[in-house]
């Protein structure tokens, strides 16, 4: 019988970013209580030797599973040290992989207070309106003009520590163009 391969998307992430993300998840699960209902599975609870941890996030009758891996093949760069993250959406026996932006939007639908388009309607009906969005990573579009006007009136309050964003976890820090401070150039290069 032949080997049958399954391919899945795993974002290469450096281990310090994974470590920070895990500690943020644990903080909001056990200390702040904002991630109520989330389940953290340690590496020793998984039968798979490459799984470093799993975070199960209930989304109604479905769930989002964020799995971190270690001991993977290293990438083409020195800093690709064999760490990675995969994101799955599961409902009963069906599962599919999702990208980090969609994962953040799904988390935002079910968790964390938000000052969004519905705030305008709630304010008109006399309901209590949350003055800010706690989970900015869940927004990837510009709000309506009414929303932007209301948001301009209310100054956002920074949350310490920040909420665990899947997009932030998987972003590519290494291939971003470097920003340099000032105009430091060699005098011989520009002729002055």
Swiss-Prot record:
Short sequence motif named HCCH motif, residue ranges: 108-139
Biased composition regions of type Basic residues, renumbered to the chain: 176-192
Protein induction: Expressed late during infection in a Rev-dependent manner.
Known role: Counteracts the innate antiviral activity of host APOBEC3F and APOBEC3G by promoting their ubiquitination and degradation. Acts as a substrate recognition component of an E3 ubiquitin-protein ligase complex: mechanistically, Vif hijacks a host cullin-5-RING E3 ubiquitin-protein ligase complex (ECS complex) and the transcription coactivator CBFB/CBF-beta to form an active E3 ubiquitin-protein ligase complex that targets APOBEC3G and APOBEC3F for polyubiquitination, leading to their degradation by the proteasome.
Assembly and binders: Homomultimer; in vitro and presumably in vivo. Interacts with viral RNA and Pr55Gag precursor; these interactions mediate Vif incorporation into the virion. Interacts with the viral reverse transcriptase. Forms cullin-5-RING E3 ubiquitin-protein ligase complex (ECS complex) by interacting with host CUL5, RBX2, elongin BC complex (ELOB and ELOC) and CBFB/CBF-beta. Within the ECS complex, Vif interacts directly with host CUL5, ELOC and APOBEC (APOBEC3F and APOBEC3G) substrates.
Similarity field: Belongs to the primate lentivirus group Vif protein family.
Protein name listed in UniProt: Virion infectivity factor
Origin species: Human immunodeficiency virus type 1 group M subtype B (isolate N1T-A) (HIV-1)
Top-level taxonomy: Viruses, Riboviria, Pararnavirae, Artverviricota, Revtraviricetes
Originating gene: vif
């Amino acid at each position: 019988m032949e080997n049958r391969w399954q391919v899945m998307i795993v974002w290469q992430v450096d281990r310090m970013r994974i470590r920070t993300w895990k500690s943020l998840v644990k903080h909001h699960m056990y200390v702040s209580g904002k991630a109520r209902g989330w389940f953290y599975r340690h590496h020793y609870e998984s039968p798979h030797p490459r799984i470093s941890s799993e975070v199960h996030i209930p989304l109604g009758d479905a769930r989002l599973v964020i799995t971190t891996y270690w001991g993977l093949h290293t990438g083409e760069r020195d800093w690709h040290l064999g760490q990675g993250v995969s994101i799955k959406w599961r409902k009963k026996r069906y599962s599919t992989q999702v990208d980090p932006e969609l994962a953040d939007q799904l988390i935002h639908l079910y968790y964390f207070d938000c000052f969004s388009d519905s705030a305008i309607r709630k304010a008109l009906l006399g309901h209590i309106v949350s003055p800010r969005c706690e989970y900015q990573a869940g927004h990837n579009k510009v709000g309506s003009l009414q929303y932007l006007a209301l948001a301009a009136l209310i100054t956002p309050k920074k949350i310490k520590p920040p909420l665990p964003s899947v997009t932030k976890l998987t972003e590519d820090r290494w291939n971003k163009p470097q920003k340099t401070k000032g105009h430091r150039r060699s005098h011989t290069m520009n002729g002055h």
